[in-house]
Amino acid sequence: MITFTLCLLALIVGYFTYGRLMERVFGPDDRKTPALTKADGVDYIPLPTWKIFMIQFLNIAGLGPIFGAIMGAKFGSSSYLWIVLGSIFAGAVHDYFAGMLSLRHEGESLPEIIGRYLGLTTKQIMRGFTVILMILVGSVFVAGPAGLLAKLTPESLDATFWIIVVFAYYILATLLPVDKIIGKIYPLFAIALLFMAVGILVMLYVNHPALPELWDGLQNTNPEASELPIFPIMFVSIACGAISGFHATQSPLMARCMTSERHGRPVFYGAMITEGIVALIWAAAATYFFHENGMEESNASVIVDAITKEWLGTIGGVLAILGVIAAPITSGDTAFRSARLIVADFLGLEQKSMRRRLYICIPMFVAAIGLLLYSLRDANGFNMIWRCLLYTSP
């Protein structure tokens, strides 16, 4: 537990030290933000900072800091190091500058910012690349949550019903003003995920399980170590628990809602550090699980269910179900919303009117429905789309 505690403290100290240094490098000032200068009641809407933080945290987190950290824990104490060092020096820095550049440039989406610094050709490539990525993300995260919801209602509502419900929610979350659905639901889901993480953290110190220490060595403890080396597999497994390029596509959503550049460090850098803390907690909890039950289990959702029910009881089980269902849904809806904004930016279409939003959303959702039907009808369809997503993820 000593290494775990030191890593936890390092993440907190990193926010106040290295995060402040990065803030000085960027140099936020008192200029008016896009939420104030371009307010349109749809995407550019001033929101409270605490709510922006919660939305940003859930936007970038999803299932990554839970499932990824659990699988990464099989590699031993080196997973702790990657989560801590990656979050402080890579992930949070990336997220902060991605968000602040969008904030400084009128809330522009990722491809437009890239075009400012790398030229027109790169911008055009990133426009197509990023929109495809967002549609793939949204399409992938429909059937999974719907299947889990169907298991909760096996006698009354089947998977087809829940697929329709989830997709209908995606359409509404993409079209409606950001404060109508995302601004109301996301903070609640974020609080649930944080409450679950804090509960696990408390139980770690109550149970005080034997966790690997750095001085025991950084050897690969994965039972398939010969086939799954620490580099690159551990880094890929933990992924957004330390750094993810996907976050840069999400930050402009909140850059359009901030009322001060000085809120950037708590929102962008702070949300990534919080994700790192959540990932560290789950990596430690998974290490305990593997120590008690062996490493044969590879289904992260089973491990989450077992840990939360054992340590947090019925409430923990409910939170686990909520997290496993809500996290992918909140990744899917903001992916579609990001795609709409990216297309609107490069076509120069204002998004205040519903009609212009529909111009973009109708063909986008038609394409998504096609991908979804392909994944459902073809036994290998989902795997094919998932591999495409992995290949295109920045």
Where are these predicted regions, by residue range?
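Membrane-interface "cap" regions at the ends of multi-pass membrane proteins
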Residues: 10-66, 233, 260-263
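Hydrophobic, membrane-embedded alpha-helices of multi-pass small-molecule transporters
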Residues: 48-64, 201-209, 218-280, 322-331
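Helix-loop-helix connectors at the membrane interface of multi-pass transporters/channels
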Residues: 107-121, 143-162, 251-276, 301-306, ...
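Transmembrane alpha-helical segments of multi-pass small-molecule transport proteins
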Residues: 126-133, 152-178, 193-196, 353-370
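Hydrophobic alpha-helical segments and their helix-loop junctions in multi-pass secondary transporters
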Residues: 138-142, 146-155, 160-161, 173-174, ...
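Extracellular/periplasmic helix-exit of transmembrane alpha-helices
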Residues: 205-215, 269-306, 376-377
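Conserved small/polar residues in nucleotide/adenosyl-binding loops
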Residues: 391-394
